Design a protein with these regions (language model features):
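Acidic, Ser/Thr/Pro-rich intrinsically disordered cytosolic tails and loops
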Residues: 1-6, 11-203
C-alpha cells in the first residue's frame, strides 16, 4: 500500500510539474504578455466592449467576459501554433467585434506581432468546410498542448458540434421579433392549437 501511495504521489507530482512547466512557458512569452495585457473594456465608456459583446449576442455579462479570456488564448494560438487556427463560433464573435475597434486591433494588438492576424471567412463549398474542420480540430489539440488543459466545452465545443449541419445565423432586431427555441416552439404551436379547439368547442 505504501508503494502504491508513493507511486500515485509521484505521478501527481509529475503532472503538476508538467503543468507548471507549460504554464511558465507561455506566461513568460512576450507575445502572451502583450495579449494578456490588452484592456478590452474602456471604463470611461457607458457601453464597454464586453457589454456590447453581451448585448449583441444575448449573453450574460459573465459569459461574455469568459469568452473574451478564451479569445486571448485564441490570439496566442494564432501567433504560436504551427498551423492555421480556427475559432469557435463564440470566440469568433469576439474577433468580429475586436476588428470593428480597428485602431485598438491593428495598433494596440496586431502591430509588431510575428503573424499578421487577418480574418479570412470561408469561400463556401465542401473543400472549404473540410479545411476549416481540420483547422479547428488542430486548434483544439494545440490549445491543450500549449495551455496544459482541455478547452472549456461551453466555449470550445467539439468539431462535430462546431460544424453541425444546417446551421443558420442571422442578425435579428429583438424589439420587433420574438425569439423562440425551435424545439420549444413546436410545443407552443400545439398548445395554441389545443386552445383554439377548446375555445371552438365551448362557444
Amino acid at each position: 500500500m505504501v508503494v502504491v501511495a508513493a507511486v500515485v504521489v509521484a505521478a501527481v507530482a509529475v503532472v503538476v510539474v508538467e503543468e507548471d512547466r507549460i504554464k511558465t512557458k507561455y506566461i513568460n512569452d512576450i507575445v502572451w504578455k502583450k495579449i494578456s495585457g490588452l484592456e478590452f473594456d474602456n471604463q470611461n465608456a457607458e457601453l464597454t466592449f464586453s457589454k456590447r459583446l453581451a448585448r449583441e449576442n444575448r449573453w450574460p455579462q459573465w459569459y461574455a467576459l469568459d469568452v473574451i479570456e478564451e479569445y486571448r488564448k485564441f490570439l496566442y494560438l494564432l501567433q504560436r501554433a504551427k498551423h492555421p487556427v480556427t475559432p469557435s463560433i463564440e470566440v469568433d464573435q469576439v474577433w468580429h467585434l475586436h476588428l470593428t475597434y480597428s485602431e485598438f486591433y491593428w495598433e494596440d494588438f496586431a502591430k509588431g506581432m510575428p503573424v499578421k492576424p487577418h480574418h479570412g471567412p470561408t469561400r463556401g463549398g465542401s473543400d472549404e468546410d473540410n479545411k476549416f474542420i481540420d483547422w479547428y480540430a488542430k486548434t483544439l489539440e494545440s490549445y491543450e498542448q500549449i495551455f496544459g488543459n482541455k478547452p472549456p466545452v461551453h466555449i470550445w465545443p467539439s468539431k462535430d458540434e462546431r460544424f453541425r449541419a444546417n446551421q443558420s445565423w442571422a442578425w435579428i432586431d429583438v424589439s420587433k421579433h420574438f425569439i423562440i427555441d425551435r424545439n420549444a416552439g413546436y410545443v407552443y404551436i400545439l398548445f395554441i392549437i389545443f386552445l383554439m379547439i377548446l375555445v371552438a368547442t365551448i362557444f
